[in-house]
């Protein structure tokens, strides 16, 4: 019975060493999602406040509706404006 007892102790010893935590290597695919979430919320909050400040400052105007003035009005612009005036006076 002694050899069976030794084999049983040897098997239990192997199992404990196999299940013991080995030194873990750094896994490059393990991320800290809590700090990533907090950082994202901080950046989103800063961008939101910056957007509100830009809208309230009224410095950002629509550029597509403003034309560069060269000094002389375009001929087409003058005829277009006059045609609009003519149409608006007819409706009254």
Swiss-Prot record:
Bilayer topology: Single-pass type I membrane protein
S-glutathionyl cysteine found at: 62
Signal peptide: 1-20
Keyword Transcription regulation: no
Segments passing through the bilayer: 36-56
Molecular function GO labels: sodium channel regulator activity
Result after altering residue 88 to E: Phosphomimetic mutant which reduces binding to ATP1A1 and increases FXYD1 oligomerization
S-S bridge residues: none
Residue positions, PTM Phosphoserine: 82-83, 88
Residues found modified as Phosphothreonine: 79, 89
Result of changing residue 62 to A: Loss of glutathionylation and loss of ability to reduce glutathionylation of ATP1B1
Extracellular side: 21-35
PROSITE patterns: FXYD
Keywords: Cell membrane, Glutathionylation, Ion transport, Lipoprotein, Membrane, Palmitate, Phosphoprotein, Potassium, Potassium transport, Signal, Sodium, Sodium transport, Sodium/potassium transport, Transmembrane, Transmembrane helix, Transport
Modification after translation (UniProt): Major plasma membrane substrate for cAMP-dependent protein kinase (PKA) and protein kinase C (PKC) in several different tissues. Phosphorylated in response to insulin and adrenergic stimulation. Phosphorylation at Ser-88 stimulates sodium/potassium-transporting ATPase activity while the unphosphorylated form inhibits sodium/potassium-transporting ATPase activity. Phosphorylation increases tetramerization, decreases binding to ATP1A1 and reduces inhibition of ATP1A1 activity. Phosphorylation at Ser-83 leads to greatly reduced interaction with ATP1A1, ATP1A2 and ATP1A3. Palmitoylation increases half-life and stability and is enhanced upon phosphorylation at Ser-88 by PKA.
Gene3D superfamilies: Single helix bin
Subcellular location per the Swiss-Prot or TrEMBL entry: Cell membrane, Sarcolemma; Apical cell membrane; Membrane, Caveola; Cell membrane, Sarcolemma, T-tubule
InterPro entries for this protein: FXYD_motif (IPR047297), Ion-transport_regulator_FXYD (IPR000272), PLM (IPR047281)
Chain residues carrying a lipid of type S-palmitoyl cysteine: 60, 62
One of the protein's GO biological processes: sodium ion transport
Domain of life per record: Eukaryota
Biased composition (Basic residues): 83-92
Keyword Nucleotidyltransferase (UniProt): no
Domain notes for this protein: The cytoplasmic domain is sufficient to regulate sodium/potassium-transporting ATPase activity.
The protein, known as: Phospholemman
